[in-house]
């Protein structure tokens, strides 16, 4: 059984081997045939590509030869053109050279001719000079003889006659010199006046600034009338604590709709106002809370002062400046003089001074610096209680400011003479800013007294009929009696009134005095039918 199975397996194995050999032989024949076909196809393609490459190379060689011939022809044409142009230029230059040589020869001949003529003229002048010397000697000799002859018939010596002539000439020259001096002085004054007016007009035209009129009170609206009781507190403790810490008075409106804070110190009033607004908004109003909020607001405002000062310094392009000066500049925002805000006034003075100094050929930046610092002492007067001029000088010297700044602080109040163009510009700008109508405000009573005093001064003089103070007290118009005052007396009366005003006035500025003399005659015309 087992031998039969083995025999069958061998037969199967032999059959498989024969089949595999047959398949191998068949596949080999197939792949060989395919390889031969592929080889023939590749060989044909290679021959085709070789033929195409040869054709392309031959075509390129033909094209390159054609291009080379074309370039060669262009080169020869260009070379011919350049050679022709060169020949023309060379011929032109040779022609110019020949012309130049001819011109030089002509010039040389002309100069030689001129030289000969000048030599002849020189010889003639020398001869004339000799003749003039001889004639001059003859004239002197004749003058001497004539003078000797005159002296023989006169009672004066030669030296005495010379002295008399010199004295007469000296008197005539002195009179002429005096007249010239008076004329030049008048012209210089008129020209200086016109120039100063032009500079001031241009400066004010190029600058248009606002000004702030400060009141002595600040009003704060209340949400409702119940807040009055909260502000006052039990037994008035809250309001007393507020007054004690702030130093500001509080008043209530009749309808209980607002509070009024009053104080001459704007800075103190600003801190108190912000404190009260925070307390009213928060609703917790107690003595301890009042003091806490007040000190916090004061610290924040100090930081704002430095920021305000830095903004002003940057706006005016002043360069580096000490922090203390910046804080004082910011603090001037809460300082006023006759109702005019000190910071706004100082900025206005700085800008005007810069414009004026620029027109006069001075340092614009230095003039602006002196202008912003000229009233810096006003930021310290309410705390230290001293003159703002000396305080300003001390703080500026401490920070080593320019001497021009120190001079401007002194000079704008007349404590020193003006030593520079920049200082003069600051003084002029200060007068412009403070002196224009409406810039500063006084009480109605003081204003009325000033007007009345001006009129009373004019009415004291004999012959004055009426007097009117006009233009906010900057002009006094006086009407005199024509039957008592003659025309030649009008200028004298005007000068006397002006001098009286200068002696009695207690304020700074100018008052123009205008005296009018008028004659009127009235008659009646009768009309008949």
Swiss-Prot record:
<feature type="domain" description="HD">
    <location>
        <begin position="342"/>
        <end position="435"/>
    </location>
</feature>
<dbReference type="InterPro" id="IPR004088">
    <property type="entry name" value="KH_dom_type_1"/>
</dbReference>
<feature type="transmembrane region" description="Helical">
    <location>
        <begin position="4"/>
        <end position="24"/>
    </location>
</feature>
<comment type="function">
    <text>Endoribonuclease that initiates mRNA decay.</text>
</comment>
<dbReference type="GO" id="GO:0006402">
    <property type="term" value="P:mRNA catabolic process"/>
</dbReference>
<dbReference type="InterPro" id="IPR017705">
    <property type="entry name" value="Ribonuclease_Y"/>
</dbReference>
<dbReference type="GO" id="GO:0004521">
    <property type="term" value="F:RNA endonuclease activity"/>
</dbReference>
<dbReference type="Pfam" id="PF12072">
    <property type="entry name" value="RNase_Y_N"/>
</dbReference>
<dbReference type="InterPro" id="IPR036612">
    <property type="entry name" value="KH_dom_type_1_sf"/>
</dbReference>
<keyword id="KW-0472">Membrane</keyword>
<dbReference type="Pfam" id="PF01966">
    <property type="entry name" value="HD"/>
</dbReference>
<dbReference type="InterPro" id="IPR003607">
    <property type="entry name" value="HD/PDEase_dom"/>
</dbReference>
<dbReference type="InterPro" id="IPR004087">
    <property type="entry name" value="KH_dom"/>
</dbReference>
<keyword id="KW-1003">Cell membrane</keyword>
<dbReference type="InterPro" id="IPR006674">
    <property type="entry name" value="HD_domain"/>
</dbReference>
<keyword id="KW-0812">Transmembrane</keyword>
<dbReference type="Pfam" id="PF00013">
    <property type="entry name" value="KH_1"/>
</dbReference>
<keyword id="KW-0694">RNA-binding</keyword>
<keyword id="KW-0255">Endonuclease</keyword>
<dbReference type="InterPro" id="IPR022711">
    <property type="entry name" value="RNase_Y_N"/>
</dbReference>
<dbReference type="InterPro" id="IPR006675">
    <property type="entry name" value="HDIG_dom"/>
</dbReference>
<keyword id="KW-1133">Transmembrane helix</keyword>
<dbReference type="GO" id="GO:0005886">
    <property type="term" value="C:plasma membrane"/>
</dbReference>
<keyword id="KW-0378">Hydrolase</keyword>
<comment type="similarity">
    <text>Belongs to the RNase Y family.</text>
</comment>
<feature type="domain" description="KH">
    <location>
        <begin position="216"/>
        <end position="297"/>
    </location>
</feature>
<keyword id="KW-0540">Nuclease</keyword>
<protein>
    <recommendedName>
        <fullName>Ribonuclease Y</fullName>
        <ecNumber>3.1.-.-</ecNumber>
    </recommendedName>
</protein>
<dbReference type="GO" id="GO:0003723">
    <property type="term" value="F:RNA binding"/>
</dbReference>
